[in-house]
C-alpha cells in the first residue's frame, strides 16, 4: 500500500537504486566470468610462442600486414644466430673448412643487428657460405656449449626464401621469431562467453621481480618447461643447468601462498627438440639419477615429468601436465581445448554451471 503514496521523485529514486543494484550484480557476475591465466617459466621456455598461438587459434590471427611487421625481426634473428656461432667458433677453437669463410665471418661480425631492416645480397651470400661450412656445422652441433636460438636451423635453412625481395613472413616464421619478453604482456580472448585473460611475464631473472603485481586473482598457472634444456646452461649464469633453474622456480611458484587456490598446469614444451637431441646428448650425463635407456625420448619425457611432479609438496594438489610443441598450431589447439575444459570444470561453481 505504501508504494501508492510515493511521489514521482521517490519512485524515480527507487528505480535508479534498483538499476544500480542490478548493475552491481551484473558487474560481480562479469568479474566472475573472467579467468586469469598466468604464464610462467624460465626464459625461452615458449611462453610468448604460446600467446601467439592463442591469437591464431582463438583471436584474430595475423593478417599480411601484421606478418610484414615481423620481417625486420626475422632478419635480425638470422644475424644474431650467425654472430653467436661466429663467436663460438673462436671460443670452441673450431676451424673454418674454407679460408674464404674467415672473411665472410668478418663481414657478418661487423653488422649492427639492432639496425638491420633489410637483407643485402653480400650478407646473404656470406651467411649461405658460412652455413654450408663444415666448421660452422660442427659449431652448430655443439650449441649446448653456448647460447643459440632454437630457430637458428629453421631460418638459416630457408635463407633463399627469406632473402626474396617480396618476402612476407609466414605464420610459422612469426611463431619462430625470438624477442625476449620485457615487462608484462596481457592477451585477453573470449571463449564461450568467458574471458580468458592470459598474462605473459618475462622469464629471465632480471624480469622476475616484476611478476609480483600479477599474483592477484589468478585462476590457473600455466608453467612452461623446455624439455630440450636438460643439457643447457643459463644465459645469465653459464655454469647453472637450465632445467635445474626451471625446476627450482617451479617449486617456488607452486608453494607460494598466493597460489594455493590456483590450479597448476604444466606444459612440458619443445618435445620435438627433445626427440632430436636425445639421440646424441644423453640425459644421464646431466641427471645421473636417470636410469632409463639412452636415445629414448619417451623414457626421457617420463623422467622429466616426474622431476617436476616431485617438486610438489602437497600431494592433495593435482598438477595437470601436457607434452607440447608450441610452434605446432594443431598440437596447441588440441592441448588448450583440454586445458580449457579442466579450468572450466574446476570453476563450475564460480560460473553457476552446476
From Swiss-Prot:
Pfam family, one: G-alpha
GO MF annotations in UniProt: G protein-coupled receptor binding; G-protein beta/gamma-subunit complex binding; GTP binding; GTPase activity; metal ion binding
Region spans: G1 motif: 36-49
Family membership noted in the UniProt record: Belongs to the G-alpha family. G(q) subfamily.
Start and end residues of each G-alpha domain: 33-354
Name listed for the protein in its UniProt record: Guanine nucleotide-binding protein subunit alpha-14
Subunit structure: G proteins are composed of 3 units; alpha, beta and gamma. The alpha chain contains the guanine nucleotide binding site.
Function per UniProt: Guanine nucleotide-binding proteins (G proteins) are involved as modulators or transducers in various transmembrane signaling systems. Acts as an activator of phospholipase C. Mediates responses to trypsin.
GO biological processes: action potential; adenylate cyclase-modulating G protein-coupled receptor signaling pathway; phospholipase C-activating dopamine receptor signaling pathway
Region named G3 motif: 196-205
Keywords recorded for this protein, A-Z: GTP-binding, Magnesium, Metal-binding, Nucleotide-binding, Transducer
Binding site residues for GTP: 41-48, 175-181, 200-204, 269-272, 326
Gene3D superfamilies associated with the record: GI Alpha 1, domain 2-like, P-loop containing nucleotide triphosphate hydrolases
Annotated stretches, region: G4 motif: 265-272
Metal-binding as UniProt keyword: yes
Region (G2 motif): 173-181
Record bears the keyword Cytoplasm: no
Source organism: Xenopus laevis (African clawed frog)
Region named G5 motif: 324-329
Binding site for Mg(2+): 48, 181
GO CC term, one of those recorded: cytoplasm
